[in-house]
Amino acid sequence: MWCFRLSRHFIVYLFSLCAILLLAGCVQSRGGFVSKNHVILAEQNPNTHFEQEVMIVRLSQVLLVGKMSNEERASLHFERGVLYDSLGLWGLARYDFTQALALQPKMASVYNYLGLYLLLEEDYDGALEAFNTVFELDSGYDYTHLNRGLNFYYVGRYHLAQQDFLQFYQADTKDPYRVLWLYLNEQKLKPQEAQTNLVERAKGLSEDFWGTHIVQYYLGHISVEELQQRASEFAENSQQYAEILTETYFYLAKQKLNVGLVDEAAALFKLAMANQVYNFVEYRFAAFELMKLKPVQTEDEKEEKSAVTKAIVF
């Protein structure tokens, strides 16, 4: 098992490295994170996820032989599902979440995850139903405002997205990521006000979040080269650096996409994924944006991808 785990990560690393070398030539930049001969990525350690993998083994053993109530079993399935999700094993995570839901049908957190998976499969109606169910079970479930807002955003219902993003922002006005999604939505909904609102909201942001520096870049207060320098200073370890780069490449890509530079945006979305921070919103939606840039799937293909989840959840 140890040898298999090491080789799997090594193969993924080699594949990512080859892809990244090709991507470097796709992004035109005067410096900073990406140039023709240089791409910045976090160091990939094969043992990064070792603790999560050990926890999965332990939870699996308990689920296999342990005697427990339905509530306890549902909780363990949910916990293992979260671990699978953090490793990018979304099919296995979905299985555990649906098992948890079968045992405890009123777990709001499970509907939140399943709604997110449905959204990423472009099943917007199914995702909306799941997110609405979250609020029926727990009206204070904060992050579902982000997820439902994203659902509205990606179908072009920017007015409804604004309501969710605004409520999400108001719950924590110091969080720059809430400000960034409001800004991205307002660029579509009311572009003449988006920059002014970003300037005003930026005044209350906390320097504890890396995203505050991304906001400063969006405002034109710092260059991409300065953003790169701050990233290396902000990160305390390679895992945090991977998270910072995932976020940065994603929001740089959104900026490129919004001005019509599709090829550069696609390359940056791929770089956002290259740091393998699977459970970050920016990783998930970098993959989603890339899927949307590909030729449109047929309706039959979309329905086939989400049929299993919908059958169990609804």
Language-model region placement:
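Helix-turn-helix repeat elements of alpha-solenoid scaffolds
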Residues: 46-60, 85-91, 119-124, 154-159, ...
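N-terminal leader/linker segments that initiate helical-solenoid repeat arrays
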Residues: 26-79, 299-314
